[in-house]
Amino acid sequence: QNGQTGGSSDGSQNSDSSGKSGGSSGTGGSPRPASGGLRVSGTMLTDASGNAVQLRGVSTHGLAWFPEYVNKEAFETLRDDWGANVVRLAMYTEEYGGYCNGGDKEALKQLIDDGVSYATELGMYVIIDWHILSDGNPNRNKEEAKAFFSEMADKYAGHNNVIYEICNEPQNSDWNGQIKPYAEEVISCIRQYDSSALILVGTNTWSQDIDAVAGNELDDDNVMYVLHFYAGTHKASLRSKLESALNSGVPVFVSECSICDASGNGGIDYDSAQSWLDLLNDRGVSFLAWSLSNKNETSALIQPGCSKTGGWTEDDLSETGRWFRKAIQG
């Protein structure tokens, strides 16, 4: 492990943000406030006071496709009714309307700015997600990524609640040969402006190959490595990969997951979902549910017929939404 120590404030401000203590249950509404920026300590996240923190929350769908869910009422509902303490802003890079594919960059950056503002006002953490998908090798749009994260880190260096996720789901990209060198370059851009922000790095095979990180970690003491799972597809073998990584001292963050199959559709596997949830809570691993949308697919948290963009009742939520609301509430 690269000398990771928790509790050092490292220049992070101490304005209140919010965090949920690892494995806490029954906290209901608002999560326990945490002080200051997040630090990696061993495999755990800690707040500026050194208390263990588990983030639990929700990811948007693509910002270009479902921008209406980036609003204060939506985030407030997630915080107060679901008990969420983090929201992830998923900005696709290569898909239709994507940042690197002719999308409206200024509109996308404005949505991110709105999302950061609402989260900050509500005392929540917020993840800025460079959502690579069809561009499976993160180096494909590396220069764009470096410029984007330099701009974001410069803009939000005064915030201690902003988390940077630099490559959502790499594929066919070797950790040592492709992803790690990319991460080193992008992280150095962020660190020019912000020495202490938490940075999340995706892993190969749609962020499943976290085993490749052990012994090959990045030389930065506030990085976590990303695992994504869809409980209908990913079961015991991926859970054991997670446990092995944690046991090797690799800090893991689940920035996206759901309880259906990996297409985001299909049936729900409640048994596998519960096994995942038990493991995440047992090990204090942070997790975010995909996705805050009413898309007609199993993983969407809102019913397809519901046009409300906040203030949802249980009846407005899909089966997946109801399950995650309880999971996040603890």
Where are the regions that the model predicts?
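Aromatic-lined substrate-binding rim segments of carbohydrate-active enzymes
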Residues: N71-D135, K142-A147, E151, K155, ...
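Membrane-targeting and insertion segments and their boundary/processing signals
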Residues: R32, G136-P138
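A ubiquitous, low-specificity "background" feature that marks scattered single residues
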Residues: S8, D16, K20-G22, V53, ...
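N-terminal carbohydrate-binding accessory modules
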Residues: G3-S12, G19-V86, G102, R322-G330
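Acidic active-site catalytic centers that drive phospho-/nucleotidyl reactions
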Residues: D47, D129, E256
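A mature extracytoplasmic/lumenal domain signature
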Residues: S59, M91-T93, W130-I132, N168, ...
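Extracellular glycoside hydrolase catalytic/binding regions
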Residues: G37-L38, G62, P67, Y125, ...
